[in-house]
Amino acid sequence: MNRHEILAKPHWQPNAASPILLNMPLAELQALDSLVEFKSEHNCTELTPSDCHVWARLNGGLNAIDTAIAAMLTADGTAAAALAPLRASHASLSACARFEGISRKPRRDYERKISLYSEDLPATWQQHLTRIRDRRDDGKIKLAPDLYDRMTRKLCQYGWFLRENGMDLDFNITALRAFYTYETTRTSNRGAKLRPATITATFNDLRDFMRFSKAYPKTLIKELDSLLIKLRDRDKLETSQKFAALANIDVTTIHPRAHEILKRVSKYPNPAHRHIQRNRAMAIAIPPLTPLRREWHDLRFGRDLIWSEGRYRLRDYKLRKTRHRVGRETYPGSVHPSVQHFVDARLLQDDDDKYLETLRKRAEEQEWPLFVHPDGTLVAENYVSQVWSTEFGTGAHICRSIVYDIVFSISEDATLAGMLLNDHTSQQARKKYTGDRAKQAALAAAGKEIGDIFDDFDV
C-alpha cells in the first residue's frame, strides 16, 4: 500500500497533511498504520507488551518491531507511549531468535562411512531395485515407500561391508554370516551396540530384496528366515524391557507431570526457556491420547490439525506407516479436550488469552508447525520421544502400550478401538504392545464373566 492510500484512511485524515507523515519512510508509515489498525481491531486502549508481541508475530516478527519503533521515534520522539511495550516485545522476540536448537531441517551433510552410494551398487542389484520399485508402483507387491528406501540403504551397507573385506558383492551363506557377525559386534555413533530390532530390520530388508527380486535360490532365503527367527527371539527380550519400563510408569502421573511443567513455565525469566517448557508439557500430555508414531514433528495447523466444533482435530490425515495402502482410512484422531489447553499454550506463548482465536486462525492460514523451537526452526524427528525418555526412561512408543492398558481395563471388545487408535492392523501387533497390566485386566474381566455365568446357572 502506498503513502497516498494509507493517508486516505479515515483514522489518518486529521493528520494527513502532517510533514512528519509525508516525509516518514514508507516502510515506517506502513508499520505504524498496521499497528493502529491492529489496536482498533482488538480494542486496545493502551498498547501492552502482549499486544505488541502478537502484532509482531502476525506481521513479520523482529523486523516489524524494529520498523514500528523507528516510526514511533520519527513521529513522537523518545516520549512516545508505545515505545516501552514495543521494546519489551522486542526483547522477548530477540531472546527467542538467539535460541539454537537441534533442528530437523536442513539435514546435516555427512560423509558415508559404512555405506555405498546406490549408484555404486552392482548393476544387477540396481536393476533388481528398479524392478522392485516398478512392481510396487503397479501394486503387484506391498512395500511402503519408506520401507523401500530403508531396504536400499541396508543393501548399500551390505555392499560396503563386502567391498571393505575384499569379498564379491553377492549373496551367499559365507557373506551373510560374516555380515551378521559384523552387525552384532559393531557399535553405533553413540558408542552402543546395535539394538536387536535394528539388526532384525537389516536382515529382514536383505531377505525382502532377495525375495522380491526373484533372482536368488529359495534355500538361501530360508537360511535368512531361520536367522530372523533367532533375531526376533532376541528382540522379545528387548520388548520385555519395554514393558518393564511401562510397569514403572504410573499412567495416572503422566498428565499431572505435564500440568506441573506447564504451571512452572512462569518461573523461567527467559522467554525462550518458557517456550521450551511449553513444548515439553505438550509432548507429554498429548501422545497418550493420540499415539502417533514419529509424526508429531511434522504436524501442521491447517494442513493436518484444525480447530473444529470446539476441538483440535486431524483432518484428512493418513498415518505415515499405512498411508500407502489403497483404501486406507483417514485417522480419526483429535486432541482430547482435557489436554487441548497445552496446544492453546503453544499458540499463545506469553500472550493474552483474548488473542487465542486470532492465533488459531493465523496458524491454520500459514500452516504453523505444532512443535517448533523458540527461534522458529523445526524440532527433530524424535523430539517427542526424547522428551519421554528424559521424563519416564522410555520413548513415546510406550503410549501405544498405555492405550491397550486402558482399553483392556474396559473390555476385550474395547481393544478393537485400541487397535484403530494405535493404527495396528493385526492381532500380532496388538500382542506385541500389550503389557502385563493389560493382560491381567483381561484375565480379571474373563474371570468375572465366567463367575457371572456360574452364578446365573447356580453352579
Where are these regions (language model features)?
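Short, charged phosphate-coordinating catalytic segments
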Residues: 217-218, 278-315
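Active-site/catalytic core of tyrosine-dependent DNA strand-transfer enzymes
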Residues: 332-403
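C-terminal catalytic core of tyrosine-transesterase DNA break-rejoin enzymes
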Residues: 394, 398-425
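DNA breakage-rejoining catalytic core of tyrosine-based enzymes
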Residues: 234-263, 325-341
